[in-house]
Amino acid sequence: MVVLVTRSLLPALFFASRAPFAAATTSARFQRGLATMAAEAFTKHEVIPDVLASNPPSKVVSVKFNSGVEANLGNVLTPTQVKDTPEVKWDAEPGALYTLIKTDPDAPSRKEPTYREWHHWLVVNIPGNDIAKGDTLSEYIGAGPPPKTGLHRYVYLIYKQSGRIEDAEHGRLTNTSGDKRGGWKAADFVAKHKLGAPVFGNLFQAEYDDYVPILNKQLGA
């Protein structure tokens, strides 16, 4: 059977055939834009060099809180808004394992960060982006900047692992104590486990509010 294509249908067929290519091109440009935004934010807010020596994340990780707010590359949130464990999502590769880090390089203040870094969350061996199925080394703790210390940066980093991680030296830290949280370095943990550069990242900023004393009581401070 011979199918005749009229001249009037040719433009429609042409654009239909180009639609997948156009969509792929748009998606690639969007991803490049996000990578540029992440790099600019990590430089602007001096996450490089305060947390990372170089190599900012190439993609943005989604961090959404049940209070209705989300991290957006340095926006200002409140400790009250981020007190509960957020939903963290990224475009994971099938079968891959990931490490999640949340860290504050401004403890107790950005001017005098004598406890840099104070890490708030550490999960390894995450299959895909199913954090609940990963191994939690440090349970989630919300933001607790001391009064009159200004804005603190809370940095999220996602690393792709080359294999499973075991770290008996770090142990398991609960969210009822601040012990062993301060003086920790994301860069040291990354080097120890050969994680390379972060694939995904994000950050927000926060300063003291009325939730902080509640958190301090939870931590026994």
From Swiss-Prot:
It comes from the Eukaryota. Pfam families: PBP. GO terms for cellular component: mitochondrion. InterPro entries: PEBP, PEBP-like_sf, PEBP_euk, Phosphatidylethanolamine-bd_CS. Belongs to the phosphatidylethanolamine-binding protein family. PANTHER family: PHOSPHATIDYLETHANOLAMINE-BINDING PROTEIN (PTHR11362), PHOSPHATIDYLETHANOLAMINE-BINDING PROTEIN 4 (PTHR11362:SF82). This is Phosphatidylethanolamine-binding protein homolog F40A3.3. It comes from Caenorhabditis elegans. The lineage of its organism: Eukaryota, Metazoa, Ecdysozoa, Nematoda, Chromadorea.
